[in-house]
Amino acid sequence: IKSRLKPGVEFIAVMKGDGYRHGIAGLYPTLKECGIDSYAVAIWEEGKMLRDAGATESILILGDTADDMLDEAAKYDLDLTVFSMEGAENMAAAARRAGKKQNVQIKLNTGMNRIGFPVCQESFDTIKKICEMDDLNVTGIFTHFARADEGDHTSARKQLDLYLHAVNELEKM
């Protein structure tokens, strides 16, 4: 798969649910041999499991990280998902306590309706402010398509269009 990617495109292994019940620690050495560039997990404990298994690559927590776990996430050098100004401020405070910048990725809500900034001007303004925060390093932006596995891709296409619109608007700012 990686050989088919364009140069500069990262190959990310999603390891939610303890590696989809295969065991994160056991899968890590094999995935490393495959040339995985970074990892994504659902919760900070899974990120810790990867670090404990020897992972030095970037690890993104896809879900919400509770405020009382932000210091632990910083300790294990885990990238966080941000989807509110309040969350960003709490992440920045934890980064200051840790004495380092916190890597974060912006989550957009294009239809899954769990977490994420809605695609609207108010969100774009908030995201711009987050990008300007001294203690945060915004490394990316992502979404999670709802119903993407259905045979009819109409819904997924609408979500992709919404995501691309948001990225385009943010790049203008």
Over which residues does each language-model region extend?
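Active-site-proximal beta-alpha core segment in soluble small-molecule metabolic enzymes
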Residues: 7-173
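Conserved PLP-enzyme active-site core in the AAT-like
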Residues: 4
